[in-house]
Amino acid sequence: MKPVSRVSLGIFPTPLQEISAERVGCGVPVRLFFKRDDLCGIGFGGNKIRKLEYLLADALERGCDSIVTGGGSQSNQTVAAAVSAAKLGLAAHLVIPESTGPVTRNMAKLAGAFLYEVENGQTNVLMKQIRAVAAGLKQEGHQPYIIPPGASTPLGALAYAEAMREMYGQAAERGIVFDHVICCGATGNTYAGVALGTKLYSPRTKSTV
């Protein structure tokens, strides 16, 4: 099987940090650990950087010169994609809702991204405009690479299966076996990777979204 390519964007491994249960208002005596992907060192951090390491590697292998993606008004994907693309010399074209705030807009513009507005952040609305932007770029002679909202692709899920290998390895070094791993998300793609990685690397652990 052909190895899956990955570019280096973030600073990994990220810390596995224990947090006091009382500190976060947990009313039962449990040990809580957080996988600190917010500290991966590029943009605002977060889960999209791992996904983009695989997706942008795929874009470069395909000879693409630009990416087209988008996200909701509160999505971290737009900024993550903009700064990651800039680091690799790719143009970033971002579809965002009209309600997107100034911080996201300004960060994306500082990274050199081109912004396109739509009326709302529903996935079907975003994808329609993402495809339209990509089609326009092709007509101009560019080679765009489409990344759907949430970076929700098989490569995106693979990124978090690999993140679980990293996390469970860190836990094992400290003699810890987790009972549960909990993941929040919107599209379900990150959780798919978490569930797969848990099945592979810590089958005794229950995964919950």
Over which residues does each language-model region extend?
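PLP-dependent amino-acid enzyme catalytic core
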Residues: 1-209
